[in-house]
């Protein structure tokens, strides 16, 4: 049983490192240097691709825990926020520019989805709840 917990923590930390690297690469290469040179539509595509990459990494790693509520929450939050981003993005593509306030909301949602914050929070909840359940059993 001790070996299983070590492997779960190792897998979780590895996922956190990969998400942090993706997050850093986005900010270094696409947010600061590359993005000013491309059109608005390609910015949307780049942002969407990075959200999907982080979503895929999180899904792959969190699936290893075999905790149904955690995967449901992960999928639910991503479906809701990605849907909101898609609606805002499609409106921006087809009806012209969106207001700065809506753009700030979209940027905040995007930042939340690609940052390691959600992944970390879910991991902390899992390890705390798992630890509490283990201590109740003993």
Model-derived features with residue positions:
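Membrane-interface helix-boundary motifs at transmembrane edges
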Residues: 2-7, 61-74, 132-137
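Alpha-helical transmembrane segments
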Residues: 8-23, 78, 82, 123-124
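Non-cytosolic membrane-interface motifs at loop->transmembrane helix junctions
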Residues: 35-44, 100-113
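Loop-to-helix transition at the N-terminal end of transmembrane alpha-helices
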Residues: 35-52, 72-78
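C-terminal halves and exits of single transmembrane alpha-helices
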Residues: 77-100
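Hydrophobic transmembrane alpha-helices of multi-pass, membrane-embedded glycosylation machinery
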Residues: 89-90, 95, 122-129
């Amino acid at each position: 049983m001790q070996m299983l917990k070590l492997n779960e923590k190792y897998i979780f930390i590895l996922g956190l490192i990969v998400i942090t690297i993706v997050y850093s690469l986005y900010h270094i290469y696409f947010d600061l240097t590359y993005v000013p040179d491309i059109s608005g539509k390609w910015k949307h595509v780049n942002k969407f691709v990075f959200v999907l990459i982080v979503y895929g990494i999180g899904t792959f790693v969190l699936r290893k825990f075999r905790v149904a509520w955690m995967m449901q929450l992960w999928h639910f939050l991503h479906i809701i926020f990605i849907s909101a981003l898609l609606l805002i993005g499609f409106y921006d593509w087809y009806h012209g520019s969106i207001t700065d306030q809506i753009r700030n909301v979209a940027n905040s949602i995007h930042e939340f989805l690609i940052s390691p914050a959600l992944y970390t929070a879910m991991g902390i909840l899992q390890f705390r709840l798992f630890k509490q359940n283990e201590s109740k059993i003993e």
